[in-house]
């Protein structure tokens, strides 16, 4: 049984490819999801993707992952700077996670520099564009522990 990865994308990431392409690039979220799934499969893992613009929906999906997922890759979008609820959900389920950002948040507005997730993440990927998803999926597939079988 291969590792199971949950890919979560937060608010406005459904607009990737058309939203500020000079910052976020031209790759769409469906393209990112398709390539992430294919890469996970090539490494013997499975990947499920979830996107929501709503904080509570993301919290619910993280809670549903408890006991069913080996690792989470999360691009929290703007919730990076505001969501204690998503942070608490990630800590409550005790699933290691990678925090991912398409743009280099540290080269942008000062308020984007703070993250509620970075101090608890197993790793942080910033500024690599859509390629960052491949790096994150590969790291989870090759380095995270597989959950114990029942």
Curated annotation (Swiss-Prot):
HAMAP family linked to this entry: AroQ
Keyword Lyase in annotation: yes
Organism: Aspergillus clavatus (strain ATCC 1007 / CBS 513.65 / DSM 816 / NCTC 3887 / NRRL 1 / QM 1276 / 107)
Molecular function as annotated in GO: 3-dehydroquinate dehydratase activity
Enzyme class per UniProt: lyase
A Pfam family that the UniProt record links to this protein: DHquinase_II
Name of the molecule in the record: Catabolic 3-dehydroquinase
Binding-site positions, substrate: 75, 81, 88, 102-103, 112
Site (Transition state stabilizer): 19
Gene from which the chain derives: qutE
Keyword Acetylation among record annotations: no
Lineage: Eukaryota, Fungi, Dikarya, Ascomycota, Pezizomycotina
């Amino acid at each position: 049984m291969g590792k199971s990865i949950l890919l979560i994308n937060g608010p406005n990431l459904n607009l990737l490819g058309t939203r500020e392409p000079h910052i976020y690039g031209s790759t769409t979220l469906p393209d990112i999801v398709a390539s992430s799934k294919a890469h996970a499969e090539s490494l013997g893992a499975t990947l499920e993707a979830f996107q929501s613009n709503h904080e509570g929906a993301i919290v619910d999906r993280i809670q549903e992952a408890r006991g069913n997922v080996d690792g989470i890759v999360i691009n929290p979008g703007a919730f990076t700077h505001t969501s204690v609820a998503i942070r608490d959900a990630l800590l409550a389920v005790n699933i290691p996670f990678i925090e991912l950002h398409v743009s280099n948040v540290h080269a942008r507005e000062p308020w984007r520099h703070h993250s509620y997730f970075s101090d608890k993440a197993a790793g942080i990927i910033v500024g690599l564009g859509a390629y960052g998803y491949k790096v994150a999926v590969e790291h989870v597939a090759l380095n995270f522990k597989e959950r114990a079988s029942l």
